[in-house]
Amino acid sequence: MSFPSVIYGDFGDEKLAQSVKIGGLPLGQLMILPDGSKFRQARAPSGTAIVAGSLYQVAARNSDTMLYKSLIPAATYAVGATSVAFTTGGTASITTNQFEDGWLMIAGSAGSGSPKGEKYRIKSNNSAASGSTTCTLTLYPEDALKTAIAAGTIRIGVVANDYQSPVVTTADTVLDVIVGVAPIAASAGFYYW
């Protein structure tokens, strides 16, 4: 499945909010209106509604740095695989689809032939408690593994999409990248522009 890097909308398109991805488009999809106004598709946090007119920023990054570069795959995965599982560690629990439209990053390994630096788009993931629970990432079929991943030797990381569960920004809470001003109210867990 491929998507245009930019879509062009009409006035009023930015006021749409719904429980499934708008137009089946990925989080972060750019939409430009006739006057040049720009909007990106985002998803409200599962427990918090979006307030129209409020300024939003990227949600706080998980403090468990293991998620970014030190996860060990639960098995060996062949070229063409579209799912990769890892065992959670540290204190981070993972919610369902927390990494939707985010990235699986190959952080590296010992030895030659490492696919270090490769990244793959995440379609979905299951929930997993902290400690020693298995989390399975499902990759988009067109972005299947191009290099095999060997269990126990490769380190991986996961990165959430910037438009997944943004949080409201106030003058004293700017902690990350600003994602924009919500043009409408949206229910918790809904997709919106």
Where are the predicted features?
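Extended, low-complexity, turn-rich repeat/linker tracts enriched in Gly/Pro/Ser/Thr and Asp/Glu
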Residues: A110-S112
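Short conserved beta-strand and strand-loop elements enriched in small hydrophobics
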Residues: D101-G108
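Extracellular receptor-binding modules and their adjoining Ser/Thr/Gly/Asp/Asn-rich linkers
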Residues: M1-T87, T91-T96, P115-W193
